[in-house]
Design a protein with these regions (language model features):
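Extended, well-ordered alpha-helical scaffold segments
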Residues: 17, 24, 94-110, 157-176, ...
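Well-ordered alpha-helical segments within folded domains of soluble proteins
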Residues: 21, 72-89, 138-154, 187-199
Length: 209
């Protein structure tokens, strides 16, 4: 017997009208995302500096300094962008929020290396040690969050820039890892990259028909 095939329902086709959930949906859009944006930019007085946006500015050549934060610090920016994407997709477009996201994506593009590599820690601090510590370096974990965020943002806005950025990074990862001779035969110490290409491939499949 043939099994029924399940398909995702796009967020913009779902309407939640509920006194309990409406309150939290508005809270995310109006309070949490702006607060997180200020935190990423080190503008929250009582919060420890995250250095997230600053690291990207340094990698992009727009600021001077050393990398600060955890080796996976870039993922906070990716998670914020993904949350923005889901909000835009489910609650409708918001010009101010979308502008902040677009500017952040522009910065990420400037921080990307010529070969497609994207990771501010290794770009700034240890450029010669890419892919040398897959267990603790979190490069593929970070890449996974970037790819997922880009897929969500493309789905919400139809804008390709972020998707094109991570496509270059995904191509580099495919060129670097694999069973073939001369490629890296390793796997990450933290899961995330495994889920990301599913979202990416799903979008690409729709593009190509």
């Amino acid at each position: 017997m043939e099994k029924e095939k399940l398909t995702d329902v796009p967020l913009h086709q779902i309407q939640i009208k509920d006194a309990f959930w409406d309150k939290y949906i508005r809270l995310v859009k109006d309070v949490i995302l702006p607060y997180q944006w200020n935190t990423l930019n080190d503008n929250v007085k009582d919060a420890a500096p995250s250095h997230c946006i600053k690291n990207f500015k340094i990698a992009a050549g727009e600021a001077e300094g050393d990398f600060e934060g955890a080796v996976f610090q870039d993922t906070d920016v990716a998670k914020w962008l993904e949350a923005v994407a889901f909000t835009l997709d489910s609650s409708g477009r918001d010009e101010k929020l979308e502008k902040l996201a677009d500017e952040t994506i522009d910065l990420i593009g400037k921080a990307q290396c010529e070969d497609g590599y994207l990771n501010t820690y290794f770009t700034i601090k240890e450029p010669d040690r890419r892919w040398t510590n897959l267990k603790e370096g979190h490069e593929l974990y970070t890449a996974g969050h970037m790819i997922e965020a880009a897929a969500a943002y493309y789905n919400a806005t139809g804008k390709r820039k972020f998707l094109d950025i991570v496509s270059r990074f995904a191509d580099l990862i495919c060129e670097t890892f694999g069973p073939e001779e001369g490629k890296c035969h390793g796997y990450p110490g933290h899961p995330e990259i495994e889920l990301a290409p599913v979202s990416y491939t799903h979008l690409r499949a729709h593009e190509t028909g």
